[in-house]
Amino acid sequence: MDIQLKRGLLDVCVLAAIRSEDSYSYKIIKDMKPYIELSESTLYTILKRLESSDMLTVRTAEHGGRLRKYYHITDKGLKRIEDFKKEWDEILSIYRFVTKEDNDE
C-alpha cells in the first residue's frame, strides 16, 4: 500500500478512536485491535504528528499513582474525519471503476 495513503488512513483511525472520549495510548491500541494491528512506536509517531497538526491535544493526569497522557480530539481533528468520509466516497468510486475493468477482461 502506498505509504502516504496508509499514513492518512492510520491518522483518521486514531482520530476516530478518540473522538467520543479522551483516551491514552494503551486503550487506543486496544480499541483499534479488532480492526488493525498497531505497534506502540507507530502509534506514538501518529500521535505526535496529529498533535503538531493541531488535530489533538495532550494532557497529563495521574492514574493509579502514575502519570498518564490523555489525548483529546480538536475541532480540526473532527473536521479531518468528516473530510475523510467525503474523500472515501470518491476512493470507493475509483475502486469500483478499477475492479470493474479487471472483471470485464
Where do the protein language model's features map onto the residues?
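Short, flexible micro-motifs
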Residues: 11, 68, 80
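Ser/Thr-centric signal marking residues that sit
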Residues: 42-45, 74
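Residues that scaffold the ATP/ADP-binding catalytic core of kinase and kinase-like folds
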Residues: 17, 80-81
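Beta-hairpin "wing" of winged helix-turn-helix
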Residues: 53-67, 72
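Amphipathic alpha-helical dimerization/coiled-coil segments
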Residues: 82-105
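N-terminal helix-turn-helix DNA-binding core of bacterial DNA-binding proteins
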Residues: 2-42
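Short, hydrophobic-biased segments on the C-terminal half of alpha helices
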Residues: 47-49
